[in-house]
Amino acid sequence: MDGEDIPDFSSLKEETAYWKELSLKYKQTFQEARDELVEFQEGSRELEAELEAQLVQAEQRNRDLQADNQRLKYEVEALKEKLEHQYAQSYKQVSVLEDDLSQTRAIKEQLHKYVRELEQANDDLERAKRATIVSLEDFEQRLNQAIERNAFLESELDEKESLLVSVQRLKDEARDLRQELAVRERQQEVTRKSAPSSPTLDCEKMDSAVQASLSLPATPVGKGTENSFPSPKAIPNGFGTSPLTPSARISALNIVGDLLRKVGALESKLAACRNFAKDQASRKSYISGNVNCGVMNSNGTKFSRSGHTSFFDKGAVNGFDPAPPPPGLGSSRPLSAPGMLPLSV
């Protein structure tokens, strides 16, 4: 109002009307201000109530949040402790697992080495098995040959027995022949004195032939076998009275000599057979020892036969060299296996 210029009034009525109008204006402004104040106060109270309610809610929420915060702090502490505990347990488990892993790797390496050793041992055993099979096959072959040879020797032993009987019979016949020859010589001495000169020469030739036959010359075996069965008319039985011709006597003496040589050869073969039996027993023990040593040592090497005399060469080692079979006796016999002694005599 101080700032406003008061106009100049010409009359009091104008001044009064002016001040009334101004008072009404201020009154209206006051009324508006009071209404605004009342409205502001009401709004302030509402706002205050609302703010108080919000404050209460905020405080409640703050308390709840603080409680939640405290609970979460406790949970965080518990989780930290649990995490530390889990971490310690995990570290221990990792350490244990690492130790187990290292031990497992070591065991795996050992198992690999053991498997390689087993494979090598298996290969050695297979080689030893093959060598043993070969040795057993060789041994079976030699055993079969030895059995065959023993069968041949048994047959020859039987033949030897029959030959011994024949030799004894021929010895008896030779003794009888010698006795008869002595009688004939005495008779020839008697007749030589009374006979002419030409018969004397014939008798001398006959005497030389008889003396040669008595000395048992080494005649061929073929002749002995050809003349081993002369006619019954020429051979006396020891009880008859028919005389023997000189050729028959010589053949009989040759047969006796051949039979004696056969008996000697059979005795040599028997000695060789005994040596073979001894060598077979020692070789069997040697082979069994070598087979056991080869399987235990897993060397798989076949024992060498060099340096050992085969039992088939025993005849040559013992100095026994059998004669070839005669054409009359050896033609019907089966051939012996290679390396074996000839069985015919």
UniProtKB/Swiss-Prot annotation:
Q: Which residue positions does Phosphothreonine occur at?
A: 219, 245
Q: What does the tissue specificity note say? A: Expressed at low levels in heart, hypothalamus, liver, lung, spleen and stomach. Expressed at higher levels in testis and brain. Within the brain, expressed in cerebellum, cerebral stem, cortex and striatum.
- Region annotation Interaction with KATNB1: residue ranges? 64-189
Residue positions where Phosphoserine is found in the record: 215, 231, 242, 344
Q: Where is this region: Interaction with NEFL?
A: 191-345
**Keyword annotations:** Centromere, Chromosome, Coiled coil, Cytoplasm, Cytoskeleton, Developmental protein, Differentiation, Kinetochore, Lipoprotein, Microtubule, Neurogenesis, Palmitate, Phosphoprotein, Transport
Q: Which GO terms describe its molecular function?
A: microtubule binding
Which portions of the sequence form the region Interaction with YWHAE? 189-256
Which intervals of the chain are annotated as region Self-association?
A: 56-166
In this entry, which stretches build a coiled coil? Answer: 27-190
Q: Where is the lipid attached (S-palmitoyl cysteine)?
A: 273
Entry's InterPro entries?
Answer: NUDE (IPR033494), NUDE_dom (IPR006964)
Q: Which GO terms describe its biological process?
A: cell differentiation; cell migration; centrosome localization; chromosome segregation; establishment of chromosome localization; establishment of mitotic spindle orientation; lysosome localization; microtubule nucleation
A family per Pfam? NUDE_C
Instruction: Outline the segment boundaries, as ranges, of region: Disordered.
Output: 217-240, 316-345
Region (Interaction with KATNA1) residue ranges read 195-256
The protein's superkingdom reads Eukaryota
Region of interest (Required for localization to the centrosome and interaction with dynein, dynactin, tubulin gamma, PCM1 and PCNT), residue spans: 256-291
Record region (Interaction with CENPF): 175-345
What's this protein's function?
Required for organization of the cellular microtubule array and microtubule anchoring at the centrosome. May regulate microtubule organization at least in part by targeting the microtubule severing protein KATNA1 to the centrosome. Also positively regulates the activity of the minus-end directed microtubule motor protein dynein. May enhance dynein-mediated microtubule sliding by targeting dynein to the microtubule plus ends.
Subunit comment for this entry? Answer: Self-associates. Interacts with DISC1, dynein, dynactin, tubulin gamma, KATNA1, KATNB1, microtubules, PAFAH1B1, PCM1, PCNT, and YWHAE. Interacts directly with NEFL and indirectly with NEFH. Interacts (via C-terminus) with CENPF. Interacts with ZNF365. Interacts with PLEKHM1 (via N- and C-terminus). Interacts with GTP-bound RAB9A; the interaction may lead to RAB9A-dynein motor tethering.
According to UniProt, the name of this protein is Nuclear distribution protein nudE-like 1
**Which organism does this record belong to?**
Oryctolagus cuniculus
Q: Organism classification, top ranks?
A: Eukaryota, Metazoa, Chordata, Craniata, Vertebrata
Which gene is the coding source of this polypeptide chain?
NDEL1
